[in-house]
Amino acid sequence: MSKSLPYSVKDIHYDNAKFRHRSPLKVFSQSLLTLSTKRNYASCSTGKFLILILFFGVACLMLMSKSPNESGLNEKGKVTFVGGLRLGGLLRKPPRLPPRLSPDEGQLRGSSTNGSTISNSDPKWAARQQSVKEAFDHAWSGYRKYAMGYDELMPISQKGVDGLGGLGATVVDALDTAMIMGLDNIVSEAGSWVETHLLERISQKGQVNLFETTIRVLGGLLSAYHLSGGEQGTVNMTHVGPKPVIYLNIAKDLADRLLSAFTSSPTPVPFCDVILHESTAHPAPGGASSTAEVASVQLEFNYLSSISGDPKYSTEAMKVLAHIKTLPKTEGLVPIYISPQTGDFVGENIRLGSRGDSYYEYLIKVWLQQGAKLNSNFTYLHDMYIEAMKGVRHLLVQNSIPKGLVFVGELPYGSKGEFSPKMDHLVCFLPGTLALGATKGLTKEQALKENLLSFEDLENLKLAEDLAKTCFEMYEVTATGLAPEIAYFHTKDYTEDGLDGGNKSSMYANDIIIKPADRHNLLRPETVESLFVLYRITKDTKYRDQGWQIFEAFEKYTKVKSGGYTSLDDVTEVPPHRRDKMETFFLGETLKYLYLLFGDDSVIPLDKFVFNTEAHPLPIRRNT
C-alpha cells in the first residue's frame, strides 16, 4: 500500500497557515509596506510624499464620481462615504487566493499525468471517440453482410455461427451501443430485426444457458427499453426503431421461460440450462452450476420486475443471493461451483476469474441498483462485498518479482492449499468494480469533498489503481500490444523462464509469464471497462491514453477488411495468427466502453446507472 497519508486525513496535517484570517487594518498596512519595499524610488522622502498624494487623489476621484444623493446611511443603516462607498471598501481585503493544495491533492485536481486538464470537449478525444464509432460501424457492417440473425460472425470465413442458442445475440448485444453512439441506421436495422424475428426465435429454440442468455439478450432488451424512452421523463437516446414496449414485451416472454431454471430447482440455486420452447430447465451434465452464473442475473430480473410491475422475477433471482449469504465462506470468498440439488458449494477452488468473477461484481452493483443506503433490505449485499474484498487483499493479492506488479491469484485447493500466481484477463473487471464500490459512482474528488470515503474505500481504490496498471501491462508486454487470455506472474515461490510476451522493451517482461495455451485474445472488454470507470472516477487521463493504445492495437491486428474484427491465436507473435471469430461482447462491451471512455461524463453517469456484466446500462433505483 502507499506510504502517503490516507486521503481522508491529508488536509489535517498539511500546513495551510499562509491563508489564515487577517484583519482589514493589517491587510491595509501590509499592503503599504509591501508597496514601499518593492519600489526603489519610494525609498526617499519625496517619493513617499508623492505616493501619498497619488493614493488620496485616487480616493477623492472615486468619492466624487457618485451622485451626492447617495450619501448618508444605506438601506441597512451602515455608514458610508459620499457616493455610497463604504469605509470598508478602502480597507477591503485583497481577493482571496485559492487555498494551497498538498502535493497529493494537487494531483487529484489535475486530471492528466503531466498536470494538465483535458476537457471532454477536447477535439483530440472527440476525434478518437469518432474512430471508435467508425470501428463499431465496420464491425456491424461485417455482421450484417455475412451473419445477420446468427449469434456471431466468423469474419474471415464470412459466415455466421450460432453458439449461444440461436437468438441473434450480436444483434441484441450491439443494440444499446448503437443507441449510445447515435448510429440511428444501425438502431433501426437491429431494432427491426428484434421486432420481426426475436419473439419467434425464443418460442422455437431449444437449450440455452441461463446466465449467457440473461446478460446478453435479456440485458440488451432491457437496456434498449430504457434508452429508447421506455420510462417516461427519463432518458431517450433514440427516436428510431420499435416502440419501447416492444422490447419490454419480448423481455417478459424470454424471462418467463428463463424462470423455469429457478422454479424447477429443489433449492434457491437455479439450474444452468433452459429449454426455451418447453419452458423447462435441467442441471448441467456434472450437476453443479457456476457460482458466478447463478449470482449474476439479479440486476436484470430486478429491473424487469420494476418496469413490469410483476415482482416474480426479482423474487426468484434474489433468493439466490439471500441463500448464499447463509453459506460458509473463506473470508468472504466462495468456491466457483454450487449445487442446485443441495444448495451447497462444490469443491474448494477460489478465484476471481472464470466462474467466480461476476459473483463479486453483482454484490456491489445490485446493492447500488436498489438505492444503496436508501434501502436497508439489501445492506447484507454491501456487507458481503466488503468482507470479500478484505479476503481478496488478504488471501489473493501478491506482488510479482522483480518489478512488483500487484496481481490477484487463485486458490485452486482452498485457503489451506497452494497459491497459484495465475490471473485471467477476466479478473481485470476488478479494478473498475473496486473503484465503483469505493465512490458509489461519484468522482474521487467529490467523494473526498463530501467525506464519503471510509478507510476501506480508500484501500479498495488504491488496489483498483494498482491492478489497473497490471492489467494494462499485460497488453504492453506482448508483441502485438494485446493481452493474453491468461497470465502467470513470477514470485519468490514461482518462476518459469522463456515464456515472455514478445516485447523485450517492456520493463515487466520478466514479471509476466504467458504460457503457449494462454496466448489467445478474444477481443475481451474487462481492461477497457476498468479504464473507463477509473477515468470517470479519478479524472486521470492516463486511463484514456491507455485505452487509446489498446484500441490502436485492435485496429492494427484484429480488423478484417471485408468487415468485422477477429480474435487472435497468439498475441506474442507478429503477425499474429487469426482465430476467425468476433465475439458478441466486442460490440456490446469493448467498443462501448472505449466510446464512453473518450466521451462526455454526462452520458450514462455512474451515479445513475449500473452496467450489467455484459455492459448493458440499467438505471439505479431512486426513491420518489
UniProtKB/Swiss-Prot annotation:
User: Does the record carry Signal as a key word?
Assistant: no
In which compartments does the protein localize? Answer: Golgi apparatus, cis-Golgi network membrane
Q: In which pathway does it act?
A: Protein modification; protein glycosylation
* Disulphide bonds in the chain: C428-C471
Q: Which UniProt keywords apply?
A: Calcium, Disulfide bond, Glycoprotein, Golgi apparatus, Hydrolase, Magnesium, Manganese, Membrane, Metal-binding, Signal-anchor, Transmembrane, Transmembrane helix
List the ranges whose topology is Lumenal.
Answer: 65-624
Q: In which tissues is it expressed?
A: Expressed in flowers, siliques, stems, leaves, roots, stamens and sepals.
What sections of the protein cross the membrane? Answer: 44-64
Supply the Gene3D superfamilies for this chain.
Answer: 1.50.10.10
Q: Name one GO cellular component term.
A: Golgi apparatus
Task: Name the residues annotated as catalytic in the UniProt entry.
Answer: E212, D357, E485, E526
Q: Which reaction does it catalyse?
A: N(4)-(alpha-D-Man-(1->2)-alpha-D-Man-(1->2)-alpha-D-Man-(1->3)-[alpha-D-Man-(1->2)-alpha-D-Man-(1->3)-[alpha-D-Man-(1->2)-alpha-D-Man-(1->6)]-alpha-D-Man-(1->6)]-beta-D-Man-(1->4)-beta-D-GlcNAc-(1->4)-beta-D-GlcNAc)-L-asparaginyl-[protein] (N-glucan mannose isomer 9A1,2,3B1,2,3) + 4 H2O = N(4)-(alpha-D-Man-(1->3)-[alpha-D-Man-(1->3)-[alpha-D-Man-(1->6)]-alpha-D-Man-(1->6)]-beta-D-Man-(1->4)-beta-D-GlcNAc-(1->4)-beta-D-GlcNAc)-L-asparaginyl-[protein] (N-glucan mannose isomer 5A1,2) + 4 beta-D-mannose; N(4)-(alpha-D-Man-(1->2)-alpha-D-Man-(1->2)-alpha-D-Man-(1->3)-[alpha-D-Man-(1->3)-[alpha-D-Man-(1->2)-alpha-D-Man-(1->6)]-alpha-D-Man-(1->6)]-beta-D-Man-(1->4)-beta-D-GlcNAc-(1->4)-beta-D-GlcNAc)-L-asparaginyl-[protein] (N-glucan mannose isomer 8A1,2,3B1,3) + 3 H2O = N(4)-(alpha-D-Man-(1->3)-[alpha-D-Man-(1->3)-[alpha-D-Man-(1->6)]-alpha-D-Man-(1->6)]-beta-D-Man-(1->4)-beta-D-GlcNAc-(1->4)-beta-D-GlcNAc)-L-asparaginyl-[protein] (N-glucan mannose isomer 5A1,2) + 3 beta-D-mannose; N(4)-(alpha-D-Man-(1->2)-alpha-D-Man-(1->2)-alpha-D-Man-(1->3)-[alpha-D-Man-(1->2)-alpha-D-Man-(1->3)-[alpha-D-Man-(1->2)-alpha-D-Man-(1->6)]-alpha-D-Man-(1->6)]-beta-D-Man-(1->4)-beta-D-GlcNAc-(1->4)-beta-D-GlcNAc)-L-asparaginyl-[protein] (N-glucan mannose isomer 9A1,2,3B1,2,3) + H2O = N(4)-(alpha-D-Man-(1->2)-alpha-D-Man-(1->2)-alpha-D-Man-(1->3)-[alpha-D-Man-(1->3)-[alpha-D-Man-(1->2)-alpha-D-Man-(1->6)]-alpha-D-Man-(1->6)]-beta-D-Man-(1->4)-beta-D-GlcNAc-(1->4)-beta-D-GlcNAc)-L-asparaginyl-[protein] (N-glucan mannose isomer 8A1,2,3B1,3) + beta-D-mannose
How is the cofactor bound here?
A: Ca(2+) or Mn(2+). Mg(2+) can be used to a lesser extent.
Q: Which residues bind Ca(2+)?
A: T613
Q: Where is this region: Disordered?
A: 91-123
Q: Where is the composition biased (Low complexity)?
A: 110-121
Activity regulation (UniProt) = Inhibited by kifunensine and 1-deoxymannojirimycin, but not by swainsonine.
Kindly give the InterPro entries that the UniProt entry links to this protein. 6hp_glycosidase-like_sf, Glyco_hydro_47, Glycosyl_Hydrolase_47, Seven-hairpin_glycosidases
Question: How does the protein associate with the membrane?
Answer: Single-pass type II membrane protein
Q: GO molecular-function annotation terms? A: alpha-mannosidase activity; calcium ion binding; mannosyl-oligosaccharide 1,2-alpha-mannosidase activity
Q: What is its main location?
A: Golgi
Specify the signal sequence span: none
Enzyme Commission numbers on file: 3.2.1.113, 3.2.1.209
Reported function: Class I alpha-mannosidase essential for early N-glycan processing. Removes preferentially alpha-1,2-linked mannose residues from Man(9)GlcNAc(2) to produce Man(8)GlcNAc(2). Involved in root development and cell wall biosynthesis.
Write down what this protein is called: Mannosyl-oligosaccharide 1,2-alpha-mannosidase MNS3
